[in-house]
A protein has these predicted regions:
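Hydrophobic faces of well-ordered beta-strands that scaffold small-molecule active sites
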Residues: 11-13, 45-47, 69-71, 114-120, ...
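Short helix-terminating capping/connector loops at secondary-structure junctions
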Residues: 5-10, 38-43, 110-115, 141
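Canonical radical SAM enzyme core domain
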Residues: 20-82, 86-96, 120-130, 151-154
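Radical SAM enzyme [4Fe-4S]-AdoMet core and its adjacent flexible, acidic
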Residues: 78-98, 102-182
């Protein structure tokens, strides 16, 4: 890692894929090691999580190192629970994830405001108005939201054929109109 980054002024390390918090000790070791090894450089960390298993210890640790945390939350309960279930028991995820979001916001409000983001997935044919309304009604600004458009033909993101591209353009236009309403 050092050899690869020795000539850059800033090092960015990302944790994502599956659920990175399942191996929190490894994440903590990487952050501790990297901040010591690169003490003369700026080191930034970011992570994408489903938000279901974050603990108070993790929240405080990530706040200490200003980890940019992106939580996969699709919006209100009826949207989140439609496709996001716990693998082990098939139960819905919204209540657990949303309670953890509120815990993060209350426990580390400054870090939450500056470093916590949301990554909702929007299915084909859906206009994300309910998702935006949910976030807005919970005092989450649109600049903290990064929407992903899912492709139901598989697990891939949008395939760029004419039909899907037009759906994507239409959805983005509707979203812009929605966000610019008074």
């Amino acid at each position: 890692l050092w050899d690869h980054c020795k000539d850059v002024p800033e090092v960015n390390i990302a944790f994502y894929g599956g659920e990175p918090l399942l191996n929190y000790p490894l994440i903590k070791n990487v952050i501790d090691y990297s901040t010591k090894k690169f003490e003369v450089k700026k080191v930034k960390f970011n992570m994408t999580t489903n938000g279901s298993i974050i603990t108070d210890e993790m929240i405080d640790y990530f706040a200490k190192f200003n980890v940019a945390l992106t939580i996969s939350l699709d919006g209100p309960q009826e949207i989140q629970d439609r496709h996001r279930k716990f693998y082990s028991n098939g139960l819905n995820t919204f209540d657990v994830v949303w309670n953890n979001v509120k815990k993060i916001r209350n426990r580390q409000p400054e870090w939450y405001n500056d470093h916590v983001y949301f990554h909702p997935v929007v299915l084909p044919g859906e206009i994300p108005n309910k998702t935006f309304d949910f976030f807005q009604s919970n005092s989450i600004n649109a600049n903290k939201i990064s929407i992903v458009n899912a492709n139901m033909e598989g697990i891939d993101y949008i395939r760029y054929n004419d039909i899907n591209l037009q759906n994507y353009v239409d959805m983005n236009n509707e979203t812009k109109k929605y966000l610019n309403r008074d």
